[in-house]
Amino acid sequence: MASFSIRAARPEDCSDLLRLIKELAKYEDMEDQVVLTEKELLEDGFGEHPFYHCLVAEVPKEQWSSEGHSIVGFAMYYFTYDPWIGKLLYLEDFYVMAEYRGLGIGSEILKNLSQVAVKCRCSSMHFLVAEWNEPSIRFYKRRGASDLSTEEGWRLFKIDKEYLLKMATEE
């Protein structure tokens, strides 16, 4: 059984965070879309006004990965607001390296996130899961998550930077 600890990410973890972000993107067959740099992660998460918060799962040296990594999982989150229900914790990314799955690491990260949400008086935790990612869907549903796309019919949209710039400069 793996021994591990969950802790808040530190600035020196940014290279591991970027590695895990890229691993998650590869798992989702979207690795070409990761353009974020380690420098941006550092500035955006550890400056005076962080845009995100992050928990990491760390294993002791004797359990490091075959590539020599001690950080084996992470959850990136931030706080947002819903005018109907108030404060929310939004889970942006959540990933545990394949060789460390099934050891309770993901459950412990989610438990820690739940404690953060409760402490900050959040009404709920929101997140996205790819439709094809049945293992994750089952993981969340076992813990009480509801699928808003089927239950409430919500659709997710995005406006890319190109169109933001266009709208921002329209007269």
From Swiss-Prot:
<keyword id="KW-0963">Cytoplasm</keyword>
<comment type="subunit">
    <text>Homodimer.</text>
</comment>
<protein>
    <recommendedName>
        <fullName>Diamine acetyltransferase 1</fullName>
        <ecNumber>2.3.1.57</ecNumber>
    </recommendedName>
</protein>
<dbReference type="GO" id="GO:0032918">
    <property type="term" value="P:spermidine acetylation"/>
</dbReference>
<comment type="pathway">
    <text>Amine and polyamine degradation; putrescine degradation; N-acetylputrescine from putrescine: step 1/1.</text>
</comment>
<dbReference type="GO" id="GO:0009447">
    <property type="term" value="P:putrescine catabolic process"/>
</dbReference>
<feature type="binding site">
    <location>
        <begin position="140"/>
        <end position="143"/>
    </location>
    <ligand>
        <name>acetyl-CoA</name>
    </ligand>
</feature>
<feature type="active site" description="Proton donor">
    <location>
        <position position="140"/>
    </location>
</feature>
<feature type="domain" description="N-acetyltransferase">
    <location>
        <begin position="4"/>
        <end position="171"/>
    </location>
</feature>
<feature type="binding site">
    <location>
        <begin position="27"/>
        <end position="28"/>
    </location>
    <ligand>
        <name>substrate</name>
    </ligand>
</feature>
<feature type="binding site">
    <location>
        <begin position="126"/>
        <end position="128"/>
    </location>
    <ligand>
        <name>substrate</name>
    </ligand>
</feature>
<feature type="binding site">
    <location>
        <begin position="94"/>
        <end position="96"/>
    </location>
    <ligand>
        <name>acetyl-CoA</name>
    </ligand>
</feature>
<keyword id="KW-0012">Acyltransferase</keyword>
<comment type="function">
    <text>Enzyme which catalyzes the acetylation of polyamines. Substrate specificity: norspermidine = spermidine &gt;&gt; spermine &gt; N(1)-acetylspermine. This highly regulated enzyme allows a fine attenuation of the intracellular concentration of polyamines. Also involved in the regulation of polyamine transport out of cells.</text>
</comment>
<dbReference type="GO" id="GO:0019809">
    <property type="term" value="F:spermidine binding"/>
</dbReference>
<dbReference type="GO" id="GO:0006596">
    <property type="term" value="P:polyamine biosynthetic process"/>
</dbReference>
<feature type="binding site">
    <location>
        <begin position="102"/>
        <end position="107"/>
    </location>
    <ligand>
        <name>acetyl-CoA</name>
    </ligand>
</feature>
<dbReference type="InterPro" id="IPR016181">
    <property type="entry name" value="Acyl_CoA_acyltransferase"/>
</dbReference>
<feature type="binding site">
    <location>
        <position position="152"/>
    </location>
    <ligand>
        <name>substrate</name>
    </ligand>
</feature>
<dbReference type="Pfam" id="PF00583">
    <property type="entry name" value="Acetyltransf_1"/>
</dbReference>
<dbReference type="GO" id="GO:0042802">
    <property type="term" value="F:identical protein binding"/>
</dbReference>
<dbReference type="InterPro" id="IPR051016">
    <property type="entry name" value="Diverse_Substrate_AcTransf"/>
</dbReference>
<dbReference type="InterPro" id="IPR000182">
    <property type="entry name" value="GNAT_dom"/>
</dbReference>
<dbReference type="GO" id="GO:0008080">
    <property type="term" value="F:N-acetyltransferase activity"/>
</dbReference>
<feature type="binding site">
    <location>
        <begin position="133"/>
        <end position="136"/>
    </location>
    <ligand>
        <name>acetyl-CoA</name>
    </ligand>
</feature>
<dbReference type="GO" id="GO:0004145">
    <property type="term" value="F:diamine N-acetyltransferase activity"/>
</dbReference>
<dbReference type="GO" id="GO:0001525">
    <property type="term" value="P:angiogenesis"/>
</dbReference>
<feature type="binding site">
    <location>
        <position position="92"/>
    </location>
    <ligand>
        <name>substrate</name>
    </ligand>
</feature>
<dbReference type="GO" id="GO:0042127">
    <property type="term" value="P:regulation of cell population proliferation"/>
</dbReference>
<comment type="similarity">
    <text>Belongs to the acetyltransferase family.</text>
</comment>
<dbReference type="GO" id="GO:0005737">
    <property type="term" value="C:cytoplasm"/>
</dbReference>
<keyword id="KW-0808">Transferase</keyword>
